[in-house]
């Protein structure tokens, strides 16, 4: 048991030393940073600390790596950046943590206290900069308050709906000495459902004829997934996962019906619309899973919703639930052991049909795209050779459909994908995942435009010996935007074409392994060589530009749009 020092016997330490000790106290084992002179005292204190420091090439990448670790562990990912441009560069990662409900703490250097308010070199008001995307923004002006405010930062990042906290550190505060006790390690509070609420849920399920469940959000665990899987199996309950949350339910289970993402299976939507009870656990039913807020009426849904969420403010925020349950997914799923059907449920065929529809939708066999490289066969090969616990990472772009539709997620903490749709996330997320669990295989899917948003972090993977594999789909364009152009302004291509480097040579220039893949037959041996190389690898896959989605072409979209004019 940790016994904190008392103020009377605490040694005098600098603010930087006190801060690093608080990180250790709260269980931090790794952090990500781009160094800056504004927090040199912290860097010096880290020299002697048992914390693995990953030095990154750009603050956005560092923040995304920290967010990825927060997403995988449920503990705050830690990132340090310098003031001004360092902070603004990191903002993309903070925004991801906000929309993904990921615990994260961004520490930002700040100008000396005496210079505040004078627009000093690289000075920013971090409350104004991050106020709309962080749960809390605080500046620590007194080293004696470091334990108090860091403890609060960990609590804020993990409680209720998790999210990012931003802590500003004036450089002279970090060098000032103080005698202060360390805080006790933070603990995450679980909000539990009441027995009466669980009895009401059982009654609602018992009366339903076609219920469904939708899983999303954060504050899940491997145990919680197992518990909900057992519950769904007992009730033969069709289960759907929210946008980029497929890791919350095993895709090979007979109750799994697919995910509510982009380009969703129309049969899936029809089943949810026809349901007479919707159990939502952890998610918020935000824009993408709600299909542009069209799947459920606001504020009074046609389908009765039982909404379970860790944050009371999310219950009834958009949709008036028939039954709100204020509980974390972990506490709620533990209570589900007592919720079992009194008799055989009448909708088992409904669940079987939903799973059959998912299997047909995710079948790679009928998928044919223009060009010599058939991505359906590529996905089938990945399913054949990769371990089930492979961590898949992606940023934003049409390329991500290949993962979300065709990879069967069966393992918790195996998916790193931003619900915010942030481009460039996949590579730094892969670095963060591999740094956390080096024994796990990590595969990054990226587009050509997406990859170069944070492609420099390939150097970070090389520096730390992290053999991630990047499957880079190159169609020489910002494909998603081009797709929308053809739908809205057919034939009028504007600002979406790209001239790309040789990504095989790019990987090799950094000291990694590179392959160029132009045909289906070349992919399997290229992947095998990459896996055997022991190096960070890029498989530069050249895709026919017409193959804009697994089932659609640019020409087809253009023709359809022109026919409507």
Where do the model's predicted regions map?
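Active-site diphosphate/adenylate-binding microenvironment
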Residues: 19-20, 34-37, 42-43, 47, ...
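Glycine-rich, anion-gripping cofactor-binding loops and their flanking helix/strand elements
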Residues: 71, 218-306, 408-431, 435-440, ...
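Phosphate/pyrophosphate-binding active-site segments
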Residues: 2-10, 144, 180-181, 203, ...
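Conformationally flexible catalytic loops at phosphate/diphosphate-handling active centers
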Residues: 140, 152, 156-207, 362
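A short, small-residue-rich loop immediately preceding and capping a beta-strand
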Residues: 29-33, 52-54, 72-111, 214-217, ...
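Thiamine diphosphate
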Residues: 107, 115-122, 269-272, 316-318, ...
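Glycine-rich, acidic loop regions that bind phosphate or pyrophosphate groups
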Residues: 108-149, 171, 245-353
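Glycine-rich phosphate/diphosphate-binding loops that line cofactor/substrate pockets in enzymes
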Residues: 17-28, 68-74, 98, 156-161, ...
